[in-house]
Amino acid sequence: MAEVGEDSGARALLALRSAPCSPVLCAAAAAAAFPAAAPPPAPAQPQPPPGPPPPPPPPLPPGAIAGAGSSGGSSGVSGDSAVAGAAPALVAAAAASVRQSPGPALARLEGREFEFLMRQPSVTIGRNSSQGSVDLSMGLSSFISRRHLQLSFQEPHFYLRCLGKNGVFVDGAFQRRGAPALQLPKQCTFRFPSTAIKIQFTSLYHKEEAPASPLRPLYPQISPLKIHIPEPDLRSMVSPVPSPTGTISVPNSCPASPRGAGSSSYRFVQNVTSDLQLAAEFAAKAASEQQADTSGGDSPKDESKPPFSYAQLIVQAISSAQDRQLTLSGIYAHITKHYPYYRTADKGWQNSIRHNLSLNRYFIKVPRSQEEPGKGSFWRIDPASEAKLVEQAFRKRRQRGVSCFRTPFGPLSSRSAPASPTHPGLMSPRSGGLQTPECLSREGSPIPHDPEFGSKLASVPEYRYSQSAPGSPVSAQPVIMAVPPRPSSLVAKPVAYMPASIVTSQQPAGHAIHVVQQAPTVTMVRVVTTSANSANGYILTSQGAAGGSHDAAGAAVLDLGSEARGLEEKPTIAFATIPAAGGVIQTVASQMAPGVPGHTVTILQPATPVTLGQHHLPVRAVTQNGKHAVPTNSLAGNAYALTSPLQLLATQASSSAPVVVTRVCEVGPKEPAAAVAATATTTPATATTASASASSTGEPEVKRSRVEEPSGAVTTPAGVIAAAGPQGPGTGE
């Protein structure tokens, strides 16, 4: 019985150790799964030396064996229960290790009651079943397949594949089963059909860009510019340009300025030119350095034709070599490497390179030595000109159709405009002279650079802009012209007076006066009025005091329409008081220069007492044929209006009564004689008529037609207008 009990206990222990849920096997599996959590192995104990075998244990009673068996059985049961309790913990730990595996989170999936971080490149979404588990279970809904969605990450994008038969909505767009993988945006929402289950997807992947290198300065090391500007040659700087068409040229009567008059202006131009040359050379040097920096890096992507000549390309290629020499194939390789345009362009540019190498004297052919491998000769740059050619190798050439670079303030030509006699400071040595069309450069600018130049320009009595014809060198640029001042003496101009009518508008009664004159060469009509009554009731214009000359004589005048006729206003002379004369109406001869024909018309009419302070019309300062004097304060109580010849004829032909004014003074017995004397002195060139004398009752009479009376007739109305013809100083009383 003892053997049977011992055998049964040993079998029970063996069964416990070999069971799947054995604590030993579970511990071994846990140690394999979690090596860090496994306890360190116990140090090996030294084995005792071999000796006599131990005595066999005493035999146990059957109860003890049964107890041992029962205890062993109980221990086996307790072991089974311990293993059964430890198994779910191990499964949960394994699941947690899958979901919380080390590594950065790639995406986040959020639901109503969960949040899942995607750390693996592929995740499956569905519902758990006996056939297998998924990474993210969405519950037990039958509308969700066991494997419904699969999310995969392929840097830098996420892709979604639908595996469920019901499909899925992605931001409202239906994705069917078996459709190609859909690239997901940064954020989107999944919704399972026929359910309210939603998953919010958010990408957490951010591509870590390498930190940008700090920007280095464009020109870290700029050596000081060493520029040598030779002394300018006046003959080379002066570039006379023909006068453009359509401009106003200076009159030939003005004397030409001497050759050395504008020498100081060259100093001003030289300063501006030197500044512009400095700026241009600095820009060229900066462009060459920038081009050199870009050529040292990767191949440029600009496929446009480079703005360099073939000779410049050859110089760039040869100067980039270490030994300053290249073969023809090396030159080709350098050009195609740095300028992609020549990679796809026609091969004709290679012929141009060969022609430049063979025909340009700056390129020297060096034969290859026998020791050097390869074939073909080397090309070098002439050492005498290498520095200059390398400096100009990256200077962009001027495009076609664009004007060449020139100094905006071009050098002044020696043929500058003469100085104005009234403004000597304008042509001072500092300003250098006013620019005329002949001295303007092709790209010249009329804007003054000197601050005093503008003020001096403003002092010019008259300047104007002239627009050149299209196509001329200075087209579309204003040209400042200096016009010489006009001579002080008034030149007689053939100004034709049309027949006019001067009508008084404020006198209550009197005469309707009509003045007709034939095209004299006189510059103005003069009307004389005064508030004091003359001796015979008329306004009298006299030659002057007894013994006086016409230069000192004049009258208080009122210029009628001189501005309309384009004549200048200049100071005039008038009497302080108008002398009263006898009953003779006198005429005034022309005061023009001798030999210049002309007529001066003086209109005389009855004077009316005028109240002071009403309608003061100031006398403007004018000039009568170049004579000067002091104007007087005269009151113009009448408003005059000039009418056209058609209006005059219409007035004469109309049946309406003429404008009448009341007679102020009675006519003396000397008036007819004075009228006869005035009529006898008139010339055929001028004629005046007076019509419509008033009756004693003040009522107007019917207008009578104008008739030409014989020279001997003495019947003249009381109101007379006398006209003066060219007569000598002794003519008239």
From Swiss-Prot:
Basic and acidic residues: compositionally biased ranges: 700-709
Disordered: annotated segments: 36-79, 287-306, 413-436, 676-733
Residues that bear Omega-N-methylarginine: R161, R191
DNA-binding region per UniProt: 305-400
PTM annotation: Phosphorylation by GSK3 (GSK3A or GSK3B) promotes interaction with YWHAE/14-3-3-epsilon and retention in the cytoplasm. In response to mTORC1 signaling, phosphorylation by GSK3 is prevented, leading to translocation to the nucleus.
Biased composition (Pro residues): 37-62
Phosphothreonine: residues carrying this PTM: T245, T247, T422, T436
Localisation per UniProt entry: Nucleus; Cytoplasm
Expressed in which tissues: Expressed both developing and adult tissues. In adults, significant expression is seen in tumors of the brain, colon and lymph node.
Effect the entry attributes to changing R127A: Reduced interaction with BAP1
SMART domains documented for this protein: FH, FHA
Record GO cellular component, one term: nucleoplasm
Pfam hit, one: FHA
Annotated region described as Required for interaction with FOXO4 and MEF2C, given as residue ranges: 95-420
Phosphoserine: residues carrying this PTM: 101, 213, 223, 239, 243, 253, 257, 295, 299, 416, 420, 428, 441, 445, 459
Function, as annotated: Transcriptional regulator involved in different processes such as glucose metabolism, aerobic glycolysis, muscle cell differentiation and autophagy. Recognizes and binds the forkhead DNA sequence motif (5'-GTAAACA-3') and can both act as a transcription activator or repressor, depending on the context. Together with FOXK2, acts as a key regulator of metabolic reprogramming towards aerobic glycolysis, a process in which glucose is converted to lactate in the presence of oxygen.
Assembly description: Interacts with SIN3A and SIN3B (via PAH2) to form a complex which represses transcription. Component of SIN3A-, but not SIN3B-, containing multiprotein complexes. Interacts with FOXO4 and MEF2C; both interactions inhibit FOXO4 and MEF2C transactivation activity. Interacts (when phosphorylated) with YWHAE/14-3-3-epsilon; promotes sequestration in the cytoplasm and leads to impaired ability to bind DNA. Interacts with FHL2. Interacts with SRF. Interacts with DVL2 and DVL3; the interaction induces DVL2 nuclear translocation. Interacts with BAP1 (when phosphorylated).
Protein name: Forkhead box protein K1
